[in-house]
Curated annotation (Swiss-Prot):
Activated by phosphorylation on threonine and tyrosine. MAP2K3/MKK3 and MAP2K6/MKK6 are both essential for the activation of MAPK12 induced by environmental stress, whereas MAP2K6/MKK6 is the major MAPK12 activator in response to TNF-alpha. It catalyses: L-seryl-[protein] + ATP = O-phospho-L-seryl-[protein] + ADP + H(+); L-threonyl-[protein] + ATP = O-phospho-L-threonyl-[protein] + ADP + H(+). Its cofactor is Mg(2+). Monomer. Interacts with the PDZ domain of the syntrophin SNTA1. Interacts with LIN7C, SCRIB, SYNJ2BP and SH3BP5. Interacts with PTPN4; this interaction induces the activation of PTPN4 phosphatase activity. This is Mitogen-activated protein kinase 12. It comes from Rattus norvegicus (Rat).
Amino acid sequence: MSSPPPARKGFYRQEVTKTAWEVRAVYQDLQPVGSGAYGAVCSAVDSRTGNKVAIKKLYRPFQSELFAKRAYRELRLLKHMRHENVIGLLDVFTPDETLDDFTDFYLVMPFMGTDLGKLMKHETLSEDRIQFLVYQMLKGLKYIHAAGVIHRDLKPGNLAVNEDCELKILDFGLARQADSEMTGYVVTRWYRAPEVILNWMRYTQTVDIWSVGCIMAEMITGKILFKGNDHLDQLKEIMKVTGTPPPEFVQKLQSAEAKNYMEGLPELEKKDFASVLTNASPQAVNLLEKMLVLDAEQRVTAAEALAHPYFESLRDTEDEPKAQKYDDSFDDVDRTLEEWKRVTYKEVLSFKPPRQLGARVPKETAL
């Protein structure tokens, strides 16, 4: 049996949990961190700076047009985002030397250490930590939304946190295809806005605000706020707290089926949020009442939520970084697999690091 060709100059090969990795020699001490539906992540040390980084390898990104489209979109979104509360790219590389050989690429990002889901399992969060974490979520969302991107699947596991309680949003804007279309992966609907769960209408950026409300409530009480067993059960759980919506809201629903269903529901009174969120401060309750609104048009935006008195002590007068609009017209073009490979290869080669390589990485991107 012929042995594989030697690693590309400046690269080395290593097997990590039965998968061959071929990475740039500057990234040492590969350690598996986790894996999901689309890829695996290792931590490594950037030998130029001594900083720990996370390297993501996508599983066979070019196995189908659907996977290729997703890989291309993930790469372009990561290249686009430059905000301290949104994960961005430090580097991207391929061990393949030509377009004809191009089958894999690796995404290098700041290593954060843990995620909010794991953090909540291990400790009870104090009010000031909750405040700081929610503030960062909203700052990141304000930036993502200004770029014209909707996250769509915000949950504790998508919020990376380091030991200084600094937070970055992961996996934004990727949940565009139905998840089952990709891998049959089961999605967590507990944090999803009702209009997403039930496909009520074209949804807007405030779907992400609903998710922040669910996450914030869970941080306060230590319990998942709406834990439904299926779509309709999820809606019932939500309406036990929000109450059934008024007729004018039901009229806005685009689906006749959804309208009929909603009209047939027994009327439920809105609960007093303070009784649901024991231990929450009045300002926290007031903010949550503005986020967890069934009617998406009545929900606060990220910018409005940031202006809420709850964040008075944290508000930063410095100018927020301005988001450039993300042009997604490239993402929805119909392309052959070879064309997806070609445009992705071009994106990999055109990457410019966010700052001088070799410079000390600032605190917010390092553990």
